[in-house]
Amino acid sequence: MRASFFWLLPLLLILASVAQGQPTRPKPGIRRKPKPRPTPRFPQAPEPAEPTDLPPPLPPGPPSVFPDCPRECYCPPDFPSALYCDSRNLRRVPVIPPRIHYLYLQNNFITELPLESFQNATGLRWVNLDNNRIRKVDQRVLGKLPSLAFLYMEKNQLEEVPSALPRNLEQLRLSQNLISRIPPGVFSKLENLLLLDLQHNRLSDGVFKADTFQGLKNLMQLNLAHNILRKMPPKVPQAIHQLYLDSNKIETIPNGYFKDFPNLAFIRMNYNKLSDRGLPKNSFNISNLLVLHLSHNKISNVPAISNKLEHLYLNNNSIEKINGTQICPNNLVAFHDFSSDLENVPHLRYLRLDGNFLKPPIPLDLMMCFRLLQSVVI
């Protein structure tokens, strides 16, 4: 009997292992419920809309202490005449309260200025519309701002200078637009304008007529740099102090062009095509000229300068030699007498000549003439 038990024990172990490998059958009439699928923790994002380069407007800010303050702007409590609507992704000019004198609307997406843009704010003195997308300006909208003195419309898409500008305008900044037209008489009533900035546009020689600048009796700064001019603009206002003509294609300066500018102290004509042939003698020998920029041209000889010139930039030209005796405004022999009147010594303090075909040392006659020189780059 003990022997039969030893034979029975392996058989029971085999049957137990087979039973463990088979799945258990469910009881009749009972169905197993499928395991629930895990639900997403957050709802699925909607399908993306069509791509656009215009971000949505910013949500309204907190209520202001001023009931008339636009919700999309900021009205500083300590500066009640100012309204800050800059960098708000605005598509249009909000309703401006009448108390506002200083309006900041730069860095938005405004595309036009319709007639009703500043309907209630006729006391505006300062308007900044830089870096928008303005293409169209109603011909009457700016004329309704009689107190406007500073208008900034840089980095927009204007194709012409806006019309009917306010008479009291002092600064007009229109750089980095697409301006290729200046309407006739647009500046004729701007006697108070001191600064006109038209750099980085598409202005050509045909745009400037003999009467284009007529009326700008007190203009002090004119910036026409980075345009496509080949000639000097005609009839520039005589009161001008600073003239910027960098990065054009000007080859020639008419004889005596600068003689009618008694206050002209600053000239920039870098990156043009000026050569000795296009520079008449004494072109820049102007009594009150203090700073002269002529770098990156094709000049071979140092032009004649006046006693009062303090800074001269001639780098990156075609100059091969420099003669202090020839370019000295006064008689160099007189400077050997140290008891001579030092008031007549040339005022030149900074001279830049690098990027030419010159090599050190600096000529002695150059140093004898320009005794006040503090820096020479060669």
Curated annotation (Swiss-Prot):
Source organism (scientific name): Mus musculus (Mouse)
Signal sequence annotation: 1-21
Main location: secreted
Keyword tags: Disulfide bond, Extracellular matrix, Glycoprotein, Heparan sulfate, Heparin-binding, Leucine-rich repeat, Proteoglycan, Repeat, Secreted, Signal
This protein's name: Prolargin
Basic residues: bias regions: 28-38
Family affiliation: Belongs to the small leucine-rich proteoglycan (SLRP) family. SLRP class II subfamily.
UniProt tissue specificity: Expressed in cartilage throughout both fetal development and postnatal life. It is also expressed in the developing embryo prior to skeletogenesis. In adult, highest expression in lung, lower levels in cardiac and skeletal muscle.
Pfam families: LRR_8
UniProt subcellular location: Secreted, Extracellular space, Extracellular matrix
Any one GO BP annotation for this protein: cellular senescence
Domain observations: The basic N-terminal Arg/Pro-rich binds heparin and heparan sulfate. Binds collagens type I and type II through its leucine-rich repeat domain.
Amino acid composition bias (Pro residues), ranges on this chain: 39-62
SMART domains for the chain: LRR_BAC (SM00364), LRR_TYP (SM00369), LRRNT (SM00013)
PTM note: Glycosylated; contains heparan sulfate.
Upper classification of the organism: Eukaryota, Metazoa, Chordata, Craniata, Vertebrata
